[in-house]
Amino acid sequence: MLKKYRYKCHFLSDLKQFARILFQSAIAKRDQFSYDLDVESPYKIDGARIKWPNLIQGTLIKRYKRFMADVKLRNGHVVTAHCPNTGSMLECSEPGRPVYLSRHNNPKRKLKYTWEMIEMPGSLVGTNTMVPNKLVKASIEAEKVPEWTGFDSIRSEVKYGQNSRIDLLLEKGDCRCFVEIKNCTLVMDGVAIFPDAVTSRGLKHLVELQDQVRMGDRSVMFYLVQRMDAKLFRPADHIDPAYGKELRKAVENGVEVLAYDVSLDLEGIRLNRTIPVKV
């Protein structure tokens, strides 16, 4: 009996170790696929606009393992593209839909293609979550965001909170504005909603933004709707009620909420207009 117990303990220990190795391997592969829009990439920032490289059209076969998508190109070839989107992409990853890919020549990348957009009824939808931070920063620097003018510096990925990094930190003298940016792709009946899946990380960011307000800083939750068919923004209470509850609490505690849509075509993307927010 004791021998069997020891064997079971060793088996469970080995199983946990194996699961840990698989998880670390998945994270490493994800990091290998990451890239910067400013370094060794074909993207160009022109004022407040990000210009796409020559996009390649195809048809989505399937998205899998979260970061991969098989796409059939117009020439009949099937390629595997990097899907830079950690969300569920609810209603934005339907097989058979037209998609647009960029090609990257960085020799360090295992996947040479990146999934940039999908064509949905009524609008193109930007699927690349690397785009929003760069686009918002470029728009602020070009003074295209009237809510944020007069700041002396804009820094990205600044450490704050509980081992977190704020997307943008705007500063002028002693005044600091913490900006957290979320990519929104889900629209239902003209209403943009976030999140498209339960997000403990997003919940943590809301708590940390409130902490900054208590310390005398300005905090903003910015939702970038990467499509052109939304007339209103609200939290997705039916998907993640805890997030919606915390967002309303954050607003009560002084966190500002801002939503913008984009102007999006096969040439590039830019901020378009503010969308009313209903929390």
Which residues are covered by each model-predicted region?
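OB-fold/S1-family single-stranded nucleic acid-binding modules
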Residues: R109-P121
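Acidic-basic catalytic patches of nuclease active cores, encompassing PD-(D/E)XK
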Residues: L90, S123-R155
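Conserved catalytic cores of phosphodiester-cleaving nucleases, focusing on short active-site segments
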Residues: G58, I166-D196, L209
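Nucleic-acid nuclease catalytic cores
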Residues: M188-S200, V207-I239, D261
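Short aromatic-glycine-enriched beta-strand elements
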Residues: R66-D70
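Short, positively charged and aromatic/hydrophobic N-terminal segments
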Residues: Y7-H10, Q17-R20, Q24-I27, Y35-D46
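Domain-level recognition of nuclease-like catalytic cores that cleave nucleotide substrates
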Residues: Q226-V279
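Short nucleic-acid-contacting surface segments enriched for D/E, G, S/T with interspersed K/R
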Residues: G87-V99
